[in-house]
């Protein structure tokens, strides 16, 4: 997706050979026009899959997921990273390790929103080592729902997330595939 790659080049900041900061348009400040185009791109790639729900993880996956949900006409569920007074009974629960924050979190989805009749598209802002995706897949599996695939805004192709997911038979569609962040420069795969 050329417009996304251009945005990464112009506004992304390489913090290290493993960390790309995109808080100017994706995971702190959000560019609504770009997210609308991201949502459309995911909808076009998964339109014929019979998707009934989109699942993401709070917080940075919400904007692209909502835009894809709007395009596909389906609800969006975001896994919460902590339990609150309103999210405490009949939950699907999993653990996820955050590469960026270097912490483990418990995530949860209410069982009333996801069931075995659902065919799910997973959307997230980044794919690195696949830990967040695997935690979401675990939650979806607890519900007995099926998975159409994973839509990733930015993939760090130099990490093993894609290989892990594809080896388990999951379809992965990434809008921007980063080959390298070496020397403070973003290099794309395609």
Curated annotation (Swiss-Prot):
Keywords: Cytoplasm, Glycosyltransferase, Purine salvage, Transferase. Converts the preformed base xanthine, a product of nucleic acid breakdown, to xanthosine 5'-monophosphate (XMP), so it can be reused for RNA or DNA synthesis. Disulfide bonds: none annotated. One of its GO terms (biological process) is XMP salvage. GO terms for cellular component: cytoplasm. Pathway: Purine metabolism; XMP biosynthesis via salvage pathway; XMP from xanthine: step 1/1. It is found in: Cytoplasm. SUPFAM superfamilies: PRTase-like (SSF53271). Belongs to the purine/pyrimidine phosphoribosyltransferase family. Xpt subfamily. One of its GO terms (molecular function) is xanthine phosphoribosyltransferase activity. Pfam families: Pribosyltran. The keyword Cell membrane does not apply. It is an enzyme of class 2 (transferase). It comes from Pseudomonas aeruginosa (strain LESB58). Homodimer. Signal peptide: none annotated. 5-phospho-alpha-D-ribose 1-diphosphate binds at residues 128-132. This is Xanthine phosphoribosyltransferase. The gene is xpt. It catalyses: XMP + diphosphate = xanthine + 5-phospho-alpha-D-ribose 1-diphosphate. Gene3D superfamilies: 3.40.50.2020.
